[in-house]
Amino acid sequence: LGDVYKRQVTDRRDIYNEGIEHFQSGVTNGRLRRAIYYDYSPEYNFAQWQESGRDQGHTLMCVGLVGVICQLAWSQGDDFFAYDDNLFLRGCEYAACCNYTEETVPFTTYIWQKHNQWNGISPEEQTVVGGGKWMKRAIWALPYYHYKSIKNMSDEKLKYTKIATEYVGVEGGGGYYDPNSGGYDVLGFGTLM
């Protein structure tokens, strides 16, 4: 995100290209296909976030930050909303269904490096964690209005993202939703689209 944003401010295409290259093929979770860990399409219009087995606060942060990256790239002429046949939308649908309905979603166990500095977190995540459900975050209007208004997708394809957008309502901006850091992850400009 930093490289993509720095290009906007400094007008340095080389920095932007580095960020975009990492977003597509990097070796860390900054790569979209690593952040969105498992794709259930075409059976379901869902793609599981790597953080889904950890907690919903981190999952929602990922939705918000990836949305910002997609929008920054869109402003530069690169369409990451459509990347990998709308992978980001499937990730949004998955997270929104987990967080704003009582429906169940498929889950694929995520295993990560067991020897690291976060010894208190299970290295094998075997289920969607319900902690943090129903949190309001200023993240849903951006993907909903992009896919609805720019991509002309039907509400059927945006079912859960629409539910989340309606649940949050008009985005109040950073810090509006709660006093911890999650309320500041994304500033909430999506409603302005």
Roles of regions detected by a PLM:
Residues 23-26, 59, 63:
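Alpha-helical transition-metal enzyme core signature, strongest for iron centers
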Residues 80-193:
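CBM-like carbohydrate-recognition segments
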Residues 1-5:
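Short, small-residue-biased leader/transition segments that mark boundaries at the very start
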Residues 30-56:
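Acidic/His metal-coordination segments adjacent to aromatic residues that form catalytic metal sites
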Residues 27-34, 99, 103:
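Short amphipathic alpha-helical interaction/hinge segments
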Residues 55-62, 87:
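Secondary-structure capping and boundary motifs in well-ordered enzyme cores
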Residues 7-28, 71-89, 147-158:
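Structural helix-adjacent loops and short alpha-helical linkers that scaffold large soluble proteins
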